[in-house]
Amino acid sequence: MVKIAVLKEAASGENRVAATPETVKKFIALGASVAVENGASAGASIPDADYEAAGATLGTQTATAWDADIVLGVQGPDPKSLKGVKDGAWIVAGLDPFGQRARIDAYAKAGVEALAMEFMPRITRAQSMDILSSQSNLSGYKAVIDAAGAYGRAFPMMMTAAGTV
């Protein structure tokens, strides 16, 4: 059985999590076991209990990574956090391999493979895994919401999911 680990993001201000409880259910339905680090989704306001209800096991960073075949991340985890992963395990995250070369080299030295999700082809078949489009879309949406709040007046003819203002 493949073990998938979801670690808490270490970067300051990073509130996203690499897998939601819905995603965990899908992985388990495919025959994988999923371990989630305690508090991994606190910044995203998803309680640990939701992961347990989805079938994941919760634990410390070390217990979560121990014997993992795949480690999911929003950003690449610190190589020191990968103690105990299987030799040849996969790190699947946004890795910034050109800007974080030392981290990529540390993954190789630790015997793990790295899949930089930002290099996923931007084609229809891979659209559900395209992190650049989805995250850019969310960033743009949030920027408009923030701008509207700072503007102080209503935006005329603004079209939203709730209707047109």
Regions found by a protein language model. Give the residues of each.
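Glycine/serine-rich phosphate-binding loop and adjoining beta1-alpha1 elements at the start
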Residues: 2-3, 9, 79-165
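An N-terminal-biased, well-structured beta-alpha scaffold segment characteristic
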Residues: 2-106, 110
